[in-house]
From Swiss-Prot:
An annotated GO cellular component: ribosome
Function statement: Forms part of the ribosomal stalk, playing a central role in the interaction of the ribosome with GTP-bound translation factors.
Protein's UniProt keywords contain 4Fe-4S: no
InterPro entries: Ribosomal_uL10, Ribosomal_uL10-like_sf, Ribosomal_uL10_bac, Ribosomal_uL10_bac_type
UniProtKB keywords: Ribonucleoprotein, Ribosomal protein, RNA-binding, rRNA-binding
Organism: Malacoplasma penetrans (strain HF-2)
GO terms (BP aspect): translation
Family designation: Belongs to the universal ribosomal protein uL10 family.
Record's subunit section: Part of the ribosomal stalk of the 50S ribosomal subunit. The N-terminus interacts with L11 and the large rRNA to form the base of the stalk. The C-terminus forms an elongated spine to which L12 dimers bind in a sequential fashion forming a multimeric L10(L12)X complex.
Pfam families: Ribosomal_L10
An annotated Gene Ontology molecular function: large ribosomal subunit rRNA binding
Protein name in UniProt: Large ribosomal subunit protein uL10
Length: 161
């Protein structure tokens, strides 16, 4: 009996360290998902540098406590945690895309760069475009007025000729 307790303690410590070193993580309830969907999610997450882990609630609770994260409270039901070490938003986006197809998924919350986000805020952040998309939107907003001025100057110069 002592070996299993030691194993669970080591596992929760290892998960806690991975949570601390990640840029973001999300916890969600996966009740109703089949194995093929979870496997596809794992593959998609691997491409983004993220990892999915299904844990017993007690082990997940201990890992969160060791990481000094108390906002999730009691975890009930079958829960999974996804964390990312490369991109902050990628794990949230992948789970968000999965919730579009499967209404049985319930997001419990997430942590992004040390800030707790509830389910609603997590969904709104995950629905935003990625960083490159936001940069292109900003660039088009900045170049739009300049382009208008250039077209007006070109039209004025053509009318004078």
């Amino acid at each position: 009996m002592k070996k299993i307790i030691q194993f669970k303690d080591n596992l929760s410590s290892e998960i806690s360290e991975q949570i601390k070193s990640s840029k973001s993580f999300i916890i969600f309830e996966y009740l109703g998902l089949d194995a093929a969907t979870i496997t596809k999610l794992r593959k998609d997450l691997f491409k983004t540098g993220s990892k999915l882990l299904v844990l017993k609630n007690n082990i997940l609770r201990r890992a969160l406590e060791k990481a000094n994260i108390k906002e999730f409270g009691d975890l009930v039901g079958p829960n999974a945690i996804v964390w990312g070490t490369e991109d902050e938003i990628a794990p949230l986006k992948e789970v968000f895309n999965l919730t579009k197809d499967n209404e049985c998924i319930k997001i419990k919350g997430s942590y992004v760069e040390g800030t707790f986000l509830d389910a609603q805020k997590t969904m709104s952040i995950a629905s935003l475009p990625n960083r490159e998309g936001l940069y292109s939107m900003l660039l088009s907003c900045l170049t739009g007025p300049i382009r208008g001025v250039l077209y007006a100057l070109k039209a004025v110069s053509e009318t004078k000729n």
